[in-house]
């Protein structure tokens, strides 16, 4: 191989760049003053499990009373106008409706688990209703 001529390069001093790099690194690692603290977040699923335990312990109604009452009146208008309801009748309808929905979701969850899934899907609800004999 042929030798090449090396040209002289201007030196910048050996220690100056190192000192500059050290100050940059120190500036980056130092905590930012007045920084906004990130809000605490639970891991995915933790809050869901907590809510499941909470609602399984409780006995209160889960659907708000007035929206449910409006829904009952709207459905009843299709059959007969000017129907009147006792408050105890609306409460009985709400208790029965919520009990039905809770059982349906329990069966739906079992259908999803049977399919080796943890997420319920419309096909699970359809299967649960079909097994119950509600829908042919």
From Swiss-Prot:
Recorded family membership: Belongs to the histone H3 family.
Modified residues (N6-acetyllysine): 10, 15, 24
Protein's job: Core component of nucleosome. Nucleosomes wrap and compact DNA into chromatin, limiting DNA accessibility to the cellular machineries which require DNA as a template. Histones thereby play a central role in transcription regulation, DNA repair, DNA replication and chromosomal stability. DNA accessibility is regulated via a complex set of post-translational modifications of histones, also called histone code, and nucleosome remodeling.
SMART domains in the record: H3 (SM00428)
InterPro entries linked to this entry: Histone-fold, Histone_H2A/H2B/H3, Histone_H3/CENP-A
PROSITE patterns per the UniProt record, alphabetical: HISTONE_H3_1, HISTONE_H3_2
Record region (Disordered): 1-43
List of residues that carry N6-methylated lysine: 5, 10, 28, 37, 80
Phosphoserine sites (modified residues): 11
Chief place of localization: nucleus
PANTHER family listed in its UniProt record: HISTONE H3
Example of a GO MF term: DNA binding
Compartment(s) where it occurs, according to its Swiss-Prot or TrEMBL record: Nucleus; Chromosome
PTM summary: Acetylation is generally linked to gene activation.
Protein name: Histone H3, embryonic
Key words of the record: Acetylation, Chromosome, DNA-binding, Methylation, Nucleosome core, Nucleus, Phosphoprotein
Subunit structure: The nucleosome is a histone octamer containing two molecules each of H2A, H2B, H3 and H4 assembled in one H3-H4 heterotetramer and two H2A-H2B heterodimers. The octamer wraps approximately 147 bp of DNA.
Gene3D superfamilies tied to this protein: Histone, subunit A
Pfam families: Histone
Origin: domain of life: Eukaryota
GO cellular component: nucleosome; nucleus
């Amino acid at each position: 191989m042929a030798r090449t001529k090396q040209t002289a390069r201007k030196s910048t001093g050996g220690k100056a760049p190192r000192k500059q790099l050290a100050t940059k690194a120190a500036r980056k690692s130092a905590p930012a003053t007045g920084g906004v603290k990130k809000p605490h977040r639970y891991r995915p699923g933790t809050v869901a499990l907590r809510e499941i335990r909470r609602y399984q312990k409780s006995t209160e109604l889960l659907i708000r009373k007035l929206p449910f009452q409006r829904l009952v009146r709207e459905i009843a208008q299709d059959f007969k106008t000017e129907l009147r309801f006792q408050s105890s009748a609306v409460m009985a309808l709400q208790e029965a409706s919520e009990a039905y929905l809770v059982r349906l979701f329990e069966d739906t969850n079992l259908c999803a688990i049977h399919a080796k899934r943890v997420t319920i899907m419309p096909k699970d609800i359809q299967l649960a209703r079909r097994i119950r004999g509600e829908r042919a």
